[in-house]
């Protein structure tokens, strides 16, 4: 188990986060919620946790999967959300789930230093392919 309080030195951790914990109730609940929202048979390819700080310089990128899901664990400033292709910013509200085509160019919105140093954003990212 990773405590958000103790997790001070990492900005990304475990690309196999969910498979390592798939039998735990909280992970089953999250996986089932994603499956329900998508309403198709899906296969998890990768999962990890991001910790976003002011010194992070997130760049635009995409994934090679059918779907990318971002679950926001903690984010005091939701306006610093996920930036999608063409500079569309989707707010990152705590306990929210963003699902989009993994091939869409996207990035985490970088926070100003004055905010990010004391208010990290924690998110769980999951990549899926359709079965």
Model-derived segments and spans:
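Non-heme Fe(II)/2-oxoglutarate
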Residues: 1-41, 57
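Catalytic core of non-heme Fe(II) oxygenases with the double-stranded beta-helix
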Residues: 40-131
């Amino acid at each position: 188990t990773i405590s958000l309080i103790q997790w001070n030195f990492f900005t990304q951790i475990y690309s196999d986060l969910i498979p390592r914990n798939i039998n735990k109730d909280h992970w089953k609940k999250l996986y089932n919620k994603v499956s329900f929202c998508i309403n198709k048979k899906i296969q998890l390819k990768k999962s990890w946790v991001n910790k976003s700080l002011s010194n992070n310089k997130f760049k635009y990128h995409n994934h090679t999967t059918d779907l990318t899901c971002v679950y926001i664990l903690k984010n005091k400033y939701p306006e610093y959300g996920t930036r999608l292709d063409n500079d569309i910013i989707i707010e990152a509200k705590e306990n929210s789930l963003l699902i989009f085509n993994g091939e869409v160019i996207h990035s985490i919105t970088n926070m100003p230093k004055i905010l990010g140093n004391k208010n990290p954003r924690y998110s769980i990212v999951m990549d899926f392919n359709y079965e």
